[in-house]
Amino acid sequence: MARKTNTRKKRVKKNIEAGIAHIRSTFNNTIVTLTDTHGNALSWSSAGALGFRGSRKSTPFAAQMAAEAAAKVAMEHGLKTLEVTVKGPGAGREAAIRALQAAGLEVTAIRDVTPVPHNGCRPPKRRRV
């Protein structure tokens, strides 16, 4: 029996001008997802996916690299303008936004959608270092 060759489907090039950048910045990692206006993902990247491990994952530089990688793939689909939604308290928030602008994408709006509890769950105890 002949063995099947492992062929990957070629990514279909979409022609999308405007989109949304979802930046999730936690204390441990930064995840950047670029979607069209309906929320269908065009590209994504994260500090961990780029090979940053441990404490280097949570740095602004790692967030910058993740944003650049996601922007590069999304611009191949024709993406030009972005609305940015930022969620979380992490270090890579501003760095990721600046990297998207530096990659050549026009940022039209920046929205902070960090969830704020109305006194929900008890937070973790304070660290003593």
From Swiss-Prot:
InterPro entries: Ribosomal_uS11 (IPR001971), Ribosomal_uS11_bac-type (IPR019981), Ribosomal_uS11_CS (IPR018102), Ribosomal_uS11_sf (IPR036967). GO terms for cellular component: ribonucleoprotein complex; ribosome. It comes from the Bacteria. GO terms for biological process: translation. Keywords: Ribonucleoprotein, Ribosomal protein, RNA-binding, rRNA-binding. One of its GO terms (molecular function) is rRNA binding. Pfam families: Ribosomal_S11 (PF00411). Disulfide bonds: none annotated. The keyword RNA-binding applies. Located on the platform of the 30S subunit, it bridges several disparate RNA helices of the 16S rRNA. Forms part of the Shine-Dalgarno cleft in the 70S ribosome. HAMAP family: Ribosomal_uS11 (MF_01310). Part of the 30S ribosomal subunit. Interacts with proteins S7 and S18. Binds to IF-3. Belongs to the universal ribosomal protein uS11 family. This is Small ribosomal subunit protein uS11.
